[in-house]
Amino acid sequence: MKELIKEHQKDINPALQLHDWVEYYRPFAANGQSANYIPALGKVNDSQLGICVLEPDGTMIHAGDWNVSFTMQSISKVISFIAACMSRGIPYVLDRVDVEPTGDAFNSIIRLEINKPGKPFNPMINAGALTIASILPGESAYEKLEFLYSVMETLIGKRPRIHEEVFRSEWETAHRNRALAYYLKETNFLEAEVEETLEVYLKQCAMESTTEDIALIGLILAHDGYHPIRHEQVIPKDVAKLAKALMLTCGMYNASGKYAAFVGVPAKSGVSGGIMALVPPSARREQPFQSGCGIGIYGPAIDEYGNSLTGGMLLKHMAQEWELSIF
């Protein structure tokens, strides 16, 4: 019977399945809420839910509110980490930021104080991302951001736009991040000035994207930094592999262990409701997505961890239904 069910599932159009799953999970947004502690993020429609899945040959399937623009927030930490490694080299970066998961909140300061010498645990938490922002090449926030934008343009084929209202909203409420930055400056992990670093970090978080954009980045990472549509290596292979490992172990805030265990794909979330995920080619032996894929999801209602509530449900469902886990 199981074999018959599997044969039947092969005949079902993945696009139709995605549409059905999106509409099934959309009402669950009522159990979460948008990140209204950042005023500009609290203005969105919480019931939005969309997904885009991109394959190496350029085939794209999507459903729901897939073309809605949103700010990358913590998804951008993957990009800044890649940019820092490409410009400074992996040893230089890892001398300043570790690769260990932490059970603390993403904006916590406690481990910086109790674990000397105060090295941030990983680049996916705010302390680590601030440190990364400070070591991007350039003598000013403008130059550092220009380098970051150039990396983004290489990946998605267009220069990212900054959502000025979100940036201003975060700038005016960045009290915890300022505290983190000053502590990192005092312990000599922050290489730029505090306000300069904050500008870089908050503007990278305010970069606008769609599910298609982050699905493309996920696809490139799935292929170890190789852009399968442009047939070009755009991220060094060792950097891409390290970024994927960090996404798997640290990418979903304090729920990273749960996602690794029950979803089983590298993923990175942001408090705006985005999730960037990927399935490497080696993960599947049959369709769909036998050649790997990138996944972009948007659902602004977030859970207690800061992850998209409906987006996480959708990702878990499709990973289990299509057996996408890398384990």
Swiss-Prot record:
EC numbers for this chain: 3.5.1.2
Family according to the record: Belongs to the glutaminase family.
Catalytic activity from the UniProt record: L-glutamine + H2O = L-glutamate + NH4(+)
Record-given protein name: Glutaminase 1
BP GO terms, sorted: glutamate biosynthetic process; glutamine catabolic process
Main enzyme class: hydrolase
Organism: Bacillus subtilis (strain 168)
Annotated gene: glsA1
Keyword 4Fe-4S on entry: no
